[in-house]
Design a protein with these regions (language model features):
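Compositionally biased terminal segments of proteins
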Residues: 1-160
């Protein structure tokens, strides 16, 4: 699989995608959002990588272990900067690619499937991405979100 030349990823994102997929810290996370959708239906080029994890137990704290992620990222490239938004969210600028990590107390979509994609990297299924996009559109109005919903409807579940 030549991710670097994928139509779904911007060139600078494609260059780091495979290396990121080999990291241990990626295992509990699921790639969500426009990039996960683009990798499955190839309708637009995507630049950023949004990773989400949901906690299995009620008593677990929804937190991102950002020091561990930072250490692994620095072992394969350059972290330009990072922003610890909260205990449950951190954003890295890694090799000029925006990487976001989120932790949530439970799955918003209980039927979501994690699709194995490359090495340690999993994608959210298309139906779940559509549900997450609809929820996102309640908070913001970005053309890419509307386009993603349009693309999902147009595909009609052919990639499920």
């Amino acid at each position: 699989m030549n991710i670097e030349h994928s139509k779904s990823l911007a060139p600078h994102t494609g260059k780091v995608f495979e290396a990121i997929s080999k990291l241990e810290c990626i295992k509990p996370y699921t790639l969500v959002g426009g990039t996960a959708l683009s990798l499955q239906i190839e309708k637009r080029q995507s630049e950023d990588l949004d990773f989400m994890k949901w906690l299995a137990k009620r008593n677990e704290k929804p937190e991102v272990n950002w020091p561990s992620i930072l250490k692994e990222l620095e072992s394969i490239g350059s972290v330009r900067n990072y922003d610890v938004v909260g205990f449950d969210q951190v954003v890295f600028n890694f090799e000029d690619v925006k990487l976001s990590f989120y932790a949530a107390p439970r799955k918003a979509i209980p039927t979501m499937r994690r699709i194995p994609y490359l090495n340690n990297l999993y994608l959210a299924d298309i139906e779940s991405i559509g549900s997450m996009k609809m929820k996102t559109m309640l908070r913001r109005a970005k053309f890419r979100d509307y386009y993603d919903i349009y693309s999902i409807i147009k595909e009609g579940g052919r990639h499920q």
